[in-house]
Curated annotation (Swiss-Prot):
This is Ubiquitin-like protease 4. Its EC number is 3.4.22.-. It is an enzyme of class 3 (hydrolase). Protease required for deconjugation of smo-1 conjugates from target proteins which is necessary for cell cycle progression. Required for respiration and the maintenance of normal mitochondrial homeostasis. In response to mitochondrial stress, required for the removal of smo-1 conjugates from the transcription factor dve-1, which promotes the translocation of dve-1 from the cytosol to the nucleus to initiate the mitochondrial unfolded protein response. One of its GO terms (molecular function) is deSUMOylase activity. It holds the Pfam family Peptidase_C48. Transmembrane segments: none annotated. Residues 84-100 have a biased composition (Acidic residues). Keywords: Cytoplasm, Cytoskeleton, Hydrolase, Mitochondrion, Nucleus, Protease, Thiol protease, Ubl conjugation pathway. GO terms for biological process: determination of adult lifespan; innate immune response; mitochondrial unfolded protein response; positive regulation of protein import into nucleus; protein desumoylation; protein sumoylation; proteolysis. It comes from Caenorhabditis elegans. PANTHER family: UBIQUITIN-LIKE PROTEASE 4, UBIQUITIN-LIKE PROTEASE 4-RELATED. Residues 46-106 are annotated as: Disordered.
Length: 382
């Protein structure tokens, strides 16, 4: 595969779940109001209210309307007080029953799968991200499952903060996976009619203004490498911006499921370059001095299934950041990293999470359980 440095291809129109008024047809008389009831004392679903008037009560009520006159001497105060005390006792019993029901419901919730899935295993603060890993996130590390954004963000930051040696001399940062999601949505942030009414500066502000604020806490010029995890259509790939705003500036794209059509990857690099241009001009008031060509490494390892893309980009990032090629324009992956393997990557990532957890012994049975399911059927993409 030849190194691709040309990316002047027309942009591809991506559609991320458009919504139209015609997609929903709802009549007012179809609306169901939970807990509403009518004048006959029935809920909307036909359930009779406990405190509603029954047939016998309605009869007696009607007769009482005709005999409202009574003698004051006939009023039995003792009987009335006794009835009031009985009513109070019944109310207290109802409250106790409600408390028991509430406690039982709370216990049931704590025993539910959702309760355990939301339990937090690790909370860690990286320089620009605070990440909480829950059991549901950790379960993505079992075989035949796709990694979710939490595990991708965690491991990429772990590489930068805990794996790269201080003597490396490179300044590296990781943008969270939500960055690419927001960036990709901005590429068609306005329709053709709006575009005609806007200046070039207004168009760029509309597309990238919010994202520029997103990275306002640090200067992109301070970094030698900017790592950008990319998720498109439930597939992970990786973009690494190398030496931005210098003559050596390149965007290296890593993908473990290449197709004959590389336009999508080239468009990815083009969108990243557009944002970098915008960010540089906003910070300095000048045009970006150097272009940001796209590099696609030759002989890149490819996955043989539909669920290991996240595992591959995790190892791509580790290998590349530990030992970046000196000549990016002739980047041959197989030559640079001949012993590349992802065979034990999932268990390695499990060990990393446990090593940083303050209660690691508590989670070891979970690890054994997950690894015991290594032959299970593939799970739905997260």
């Amino acid at each position: 595969m030849e190194v691709s440095t040309s990316y002047c291809t027309p942009a591809v129109n991506f559609k991320y779940g458009s919504f139209q008024d015609s997609d929903v047809s709802m009549r007012e008389d179809d609306l169901f109001r939970m807990g509403s009831y009518n004048s006959q004392g029935y809920y909307a679903d036909g359930t009779h209210l406990d405190g509603s008037i029954g047939e016998e009560d309605e009869t007696s009520s009607g007769s009482n309307d005709q005999h409202m006159d009574f003698e004051e001497d006939d009023f039995d105060m003792e009987s009335s007080m006794t009835e009031d005390l009985v009513d109070e006792d019944e109310e207290e019993e109802d409250e106790e029953d409600n408390d028991e029901w509430t406690n039982q419901k709370r216990t049931d919730n704590q025993n539910s799968v959702a309760y355990y899935a939301a339990m937090e295993m690790l909370r860690i603060r990286f320089p620009f991200q605070s990440i909480a890993i829950r059991i549901s996130d950790f379960c993505c590390l079992q075989e035949k499952d796709l990694l979710n954004d939490t595990m991708i963000d965690f491991y990429l930051n772990h590489i930068v903060e805990h794996v790269l040696p201080d003597s490396n001399g490179s300044n590296v940062t990781v943008l969270p996976s939500i960055f690419w999601h927001n960036l990709s949505l901005r590429q068609h942030a306005f329709d053709s009619e709006d575009e005609k009414m806007m200046s070039d500066e207004q168009k760029m502000d509309l597309k990238f203004g919010d994202l520029h604020d997103f990275v306002a806490d640090f200067d992109l010029q301070d970094f030698d490498y900017i790592v950008v995890p990319v998720n498109e259509w439930e597939h992970w790939s990786l973009a690494v911006i190398c030496h931005p705003f210098t003559a050596q500036a390149r965007t290296v794209i890593f993908d473990s499921q290449l197709t004959a059509d590389l336009n999508n990857l080239q468009n990815m690099a083009t969108l990243i370059e557009s944002f970098m241009k915008y960010s540089y001009e906003k910070r300095t008031g000048n045009a970006m001095p150097f272009p940001l060509p796209c590099i696609l490494p030759q002989r890149m390892p490819q996955q043989t299934n539909n669920f290991d893309c996240g595992i591959f980009i995790a190892e791509f990032a580790r290998r590349f950041l530990l030992s970046p090629p000196k000549d990016l324009d002739n980047f041959d992956f197989a030559r640079e990293y001949p012993d590349f393997s992802t065979a034990t990557k999932r268990t390695e990532m499990q060990r990393v999470v446990l090593s940083l957890s303050t209660n690691r012994a508590r989670w070891r049975p979970l690890v054994e359980l997950l690894n015991g399911y290594s032959t299970a059927a593939p799970h739905r993409a997260l």
